Amino acid sequence: RLAEQVQPDVVITEVGGTVGDIESLPFLEAIRQLRKDLGRENVCYIHVSLVPFISGSEELKTKPTQHSVKELRSIGIQPDFIVCRSDRPIDAGIRRKIALFCDVDPKAVVSAEDAPSIYEVPLTLHEQGLDAMVIERLELECGELEIEEWRTFVEHRRTLSRSVNIALVGKYVALPDAYLSVNEALDHAGIFHDHKVSVHWLDAESLSPEEVESRLKALHGILVPGGFGVRG
């Protein structure tokens, strides 16, 4: 429906979860049928898989990736590209092994190691040519990539010299992702004003009236996001 109404060049659809879980099966079946309906040249599958490092043997293990791709292939989905999530670089030997057992080209195995900022990930993927390979795979006609503005933004964010301390007082601070959009908004505002924002998470339920001043007076600002109930 989106493709018919907006008529975009590309629609990106994420299917989360774990391959093999019953919850994701209807969605995986839907994207399998999508390639059949739209044609192979119009659909590209990119599989993001964890490649864990085992400290005992000091090696990266490819079995989880091999297993998840095997599960995908069993329901009729062959990934075109595999993005390997890891806390360290994926060397050429590991890439060749994954390519061999997952039946993809070695160039189609891309490393996505942990980065200091999520905004650095597109640059990492670009340096390995993932964007160019996807464009070629979908037979799209594109002009020259303009990535310098993004690169400048990332470098600017990395080199912020001034800082500001903001208290985020909330009910769900034990799970910071509950305030992910708020945290990102603070980060963006700080970048715009050339400041690195340090967020100090404070549990609203444990903050008593007697200690409010002592815990907050050293900070530059206070943000209390919306919540539910009288505890906020």
Predicted regions: what they are:
Residues 1-9, 17-232:
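N-terminal beta1-alpha1 cap of cysteine-dependent amidohydrolase-like domains
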